[in-house]
Amino acid sequence: MKNLTLENIARVCGGTYYGPADKLQEEVMSVITDSRKAEEGCLFVPIVGERVDAHKFIPQVMEAGALATLSERVLDNADFPYIAVESSLQAVKDIAEFYLKQLQIPVVGIT
């Protein structure tokens, strides 16, 4: 994965960073939406679905070594870095668009 820092991600998705200032320059190693795939250095994107609100998995993901998480709400008493966003789904779209532009490769759509 090309280098994306928490600071870049917060800026790109219009989010507000909460957490230690020294973590802002930490690089995200992967982006996940499935809490079962949490790994060291990942960014968790909790999606609110019809049946499950993935925000409830944030504690387990952080315990598994995630670097940070996005959240559609302010997390009181959080002792880990997170980026508050209006919509996790829109934020991950914004991050993906920014990431693709960094790669400077042609993108082809097949219909």
Give residue ranges: language-model regions.
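Walker A (P-loop) phosphate-binding motif
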Residues: 96-111
